[in-house]
Amino acid sequence: SPVFYTDGVVDSGFAKLVGQDKSHIKARFVQGASSPIDAIGFGLGKKMNLLKKGTPLRIAYTLEENVWQGNVSVQLRLKDIE
């Protein structure tokens, strides 16, 4: 599947470490006045400090369908964060 790149996204303040060993990131990104979109980054826990700064980020990701408790949504599967 294609990998997308977006510059200038900011975490909405939702970012947290998840997983048994807290090595994954769950975040909600916004860009400008756009609606927030959920994201998950497996193995990217070490990059959490970048999200807490509130500065614009560059992200690489794929799109995926997320099904949780009967609800279906689109989320970003993060490949990298800078």
What positions do the PLM features span?
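Acidic, two-metal ion nucleic-acid-processing modules in DNA metabolism proteins
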Residues: S1-E82
